[in-house]
């Protein structure tokens, strides 16, 4: 369902064909869940935003339950945060996981066709909590990274070699070299790296240096000296008027861990402090309002209600406690529209467009 003009989708499709796998295409994002139930795939390509939607669906399902069923459901959901790749659990935790799998996780697999073994994820960083939910439900997330200029994948979590780590995009692929520049930028060499942009030597010189290293534009580290972890985009980092730098993507990912925050953009270049534009998760926010007897006529009125603003602000405050003093969000503004590729705030692969 991702655009075939996108090198990520195209290259993975080539790999599927090489392995003799059948490929099914879904033309409408709204039909994905029903198509998965019908096709019953063993794996599918995705982007983090869609997997966040899947996770939100699991949470919504639990909230529809009552009594002991609801308690068991969220006990099982919370249990997923113990998941780590290639980890041996103790006897008590193993028993809990076995019970949760029979009662809850098996239902999640069934909701996604019942056959999924792997979910390929790329295009942006996936929140670790979502990777753990999928992993505990026996749907391992193969998160990787790359660019069109690198053909595209340079690193990916590899279950065949048991080289997987949550929160990273996995080990570097064989044949590639990666190093971290002094400013934190990820540089790479390898057979898949382009020779240059077509008839654009000046543009090529901006990204390939004299030693042949391609500058990816991503900021990251090598965790344990082996697993690549991307923390932000170099061009998206901005400076406050006081001289401190802000890496917005890291803050945005933390904020989106709240079930009430659908999308967020951290801003504040050349300002005294960082602020955030927030598109709420309106279905869940509507549920919260119904539960707390908060009345409104439409979303425009909803986002202006003091109790709603306070609720979202409390979610932001929790994240602020984990940030440095200069990184903390000092002001928020709620918007009444859902951000989509059609409205222009998101790209076709559901990444945030900051220059809208």
Predicted regions and their residues:
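Conserved C-terminal "lid"/linker of ANL adenylate-forming enzymes
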Residues: 263-267, 313-356
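Conserved A3 ("GATE") glycine/threonine-rich loop of ANL adenylate-forming enzymes
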Residues: 6-8, 49, 123-130, 143-160, ...
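Conserved AMP-binding/adenylation subdomain of ANL enzymes
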Residues: 4-105, 115
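Conserved ATP-binding/catalytic segment of the ANL
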Residues: 171-240, 257
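C-terminal boundary motif of the adenylate-forming
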Residues: 219, 224, 258-283
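Conserved ANL (AMP-binding/adenylate-forming) active-site segment centered on the GW(Y/F)…HTG consensus within
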Residues: 95, 162, 166, 193-217, ...
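Active-site loops of AMP-binding adenylate-forming
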Residues: 126, 134-140, 147-166, 200-203, ...
């Amino acid at each position: 369902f991702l655009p075939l003009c996108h090198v990520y989708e195209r290259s993975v499709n080539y790999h599927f064909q090489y392995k003799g796998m059948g490929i099914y295409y879904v033309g409408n994002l709204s039909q994905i869940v029903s198509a998965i139930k019908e096709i019953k795939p063993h794996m599918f390509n995705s982007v983090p935003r869609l997997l966040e939607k899947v996770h939100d669906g699991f949470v919504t399902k639990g909230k529809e339950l009552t009594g002991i069923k609801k308690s068991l459901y969220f006990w099982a959901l919370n249990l997923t945060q113990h998941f780590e790749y290639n980890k041996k659990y103790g006897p008590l935790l193993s028993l809990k996981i076995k019970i949760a799998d029979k009662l809850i996780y098996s239902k999640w697999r069934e909701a996604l066709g019942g056959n999924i073994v792997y979910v390929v994820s790329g295009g942006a960083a996936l929140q670790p909590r979502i990777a753990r939910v999928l992993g505990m439900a026996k749907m391992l997330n193969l998160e990787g990274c790359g660019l069109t200029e690198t053909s595209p994948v340079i690193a990916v979590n590899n279950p065949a070699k048991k080289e997987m780590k949550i929160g990273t995009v996995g080990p570097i692929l064989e044949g590639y070299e990666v190093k971290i520049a002094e400013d934190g930028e990820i540089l790479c060499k390898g057979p898949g790296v382009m020779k240059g942009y077509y008839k654009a030597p000046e543009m090529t010189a901006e990204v390939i240096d004299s030693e042949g290293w391609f500058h990816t534009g991503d900021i990251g580290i090598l965790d344990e000296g082996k697993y690549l972890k991307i923390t932000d985009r170099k061009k998206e980092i901005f400076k406050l008027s006081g001289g401190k730098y802000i890496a917005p993507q890291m803050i945005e990912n933390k904020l989106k861990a709240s079930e009430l925050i659908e999308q967020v953009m951290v801003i504040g270049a050349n300002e005294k402090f960082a602020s955030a534009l927030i598109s709420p998760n309106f279905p869940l926010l509507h549920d919260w309002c119904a539960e707390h007897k908060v009345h409104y006529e439409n979303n425009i009125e909803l986002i202006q209600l003091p109790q709603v603003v306070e609720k979202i602000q409390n979610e932001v405050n929790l994240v602020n406690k984990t940030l440095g003093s200069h990184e903390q969000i000092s002001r928020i503004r709620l918007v009444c529209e859902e951000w989509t590729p059609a409205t222009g705030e998101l790209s076709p692969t559901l990444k945030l467009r900051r220059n809208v």
